[in-house]
């Protein structure tokens, strides 16, 4: 698995993820890029779960964003509907976080499209550790990127499926 986190604070939205790819109990790769910009570069997405499944879902989300430009919520809901009802997609094992300047969403294979509270959310094997760490840091004066990095570091210290090779994408919300 992996850990992906988003933090929305101080006019920034940050998504960060670690780089570990595991096959069973073996680390196969330590520098995978599981957080990236999609669409026209105005949406950031991160995934946890089976890599091939996640790429399939990212491609589908990009197509939905082409259908519904500038409407991340609508694109995410349409993807979740397809994911839940399509026989092939229903078997995909992945979760996604997506964010643009106005909204952050968690998308699951159960058809859930969730907008987090408190300015942060996390998914993956170390998601609960990262989420708790970020929540604890949200009331400090630390900027969004520092909170995301620190939360992932804490998750990587605890979760064997998360490493310290962190990739960060950032959007300016106020521009």
Curated annotation (Swiss-Prot):
GO terms for biological process: proteolysis involved in protein catabolic process. InterPro entries: ATP-dep_Prtase_HsIV_su, Ntn_hydrolases_N, Proteasome_sua/b, Proteasome_suB-type. The keyword Hydrolase applies. Keywords: Allosteric enzyme, Cytoplasm, Hydrolase, Metal-binding, Protease, Sodium, Stress response, Threonine protease. It is found in: Cytoplasm. Allosterically activated by HslU binding. Gene3D superfamilies: Glutamine Phosphoribosylpyrophosphate, subunit 1, domain 1. The active site is at 2. Its EC number is 3.4.25.2. GO terms for cellular component: HslUV protease complex; proteasome core complex. It comes from the Bacteria. One of its GO terms (molecular function) is threonine-type endopeptidase activity. Na(+) binds at residues 156, 159, 162. It catalyses: ATP-dependent cleavage of peptide bonds with broad specificity. SUPFAM superfamilies: N-terminal nucleophile aminohydrolases (Ntn hydrolases). A double ring-shaped homohexamer of HslV is capped on each side by a ring-shaped HslU homohexamer. The assembly of the HslU/HslV complex is dependent on binding of ATP. Belongs to the peptidase T1B family. HslV subfamily. Protease subunit of a proteasome-like degradation complex believed to be a general protein degrading machinery. This is ATP-dependent protease subunit HslV. It comes from Rhizobium etli (strain ATCC 51251 / DSM 11541 / JCM 21823 / NBRC 15573 / CFN 42).
């Amino acid at each position: 698995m992996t850990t992906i986190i988003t933090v929305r604070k101080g006019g920034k939205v940050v998504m960060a993820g670690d780089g570990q790819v595991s096959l069973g109990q073996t680390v196969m790769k330590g520098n995978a890029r599981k957080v990236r910009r999609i669409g026209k570069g105005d949406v950031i997405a991160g995934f946890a779960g089976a890599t091939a499944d996640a790429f399939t879902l990212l491609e589908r989300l990009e197509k939905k964003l082409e259908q519904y430009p500038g409407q991340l919520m609508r694109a995410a809901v349409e993807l979740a509907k397809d994911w839940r009802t399509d026989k092939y997609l229903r078997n995909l094992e992945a979760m996604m976080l997506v964010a643009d300047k106005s909204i952050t969403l968690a998308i699951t294979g159960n058809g859930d499209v969730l907008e987090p509270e408190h300015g942060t959310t996390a998914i993956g094997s170390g998601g609960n550790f990262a989420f708790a760490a970020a929540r604890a840091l949200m009331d400090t004066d630390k900027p969004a990127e520092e909170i995301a990095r620190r939360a992932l570091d804490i998750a990587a210290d605890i979760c064997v499926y998360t490493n310290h090779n962190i990739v960060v994408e950032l959007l300016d919300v106020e521009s």
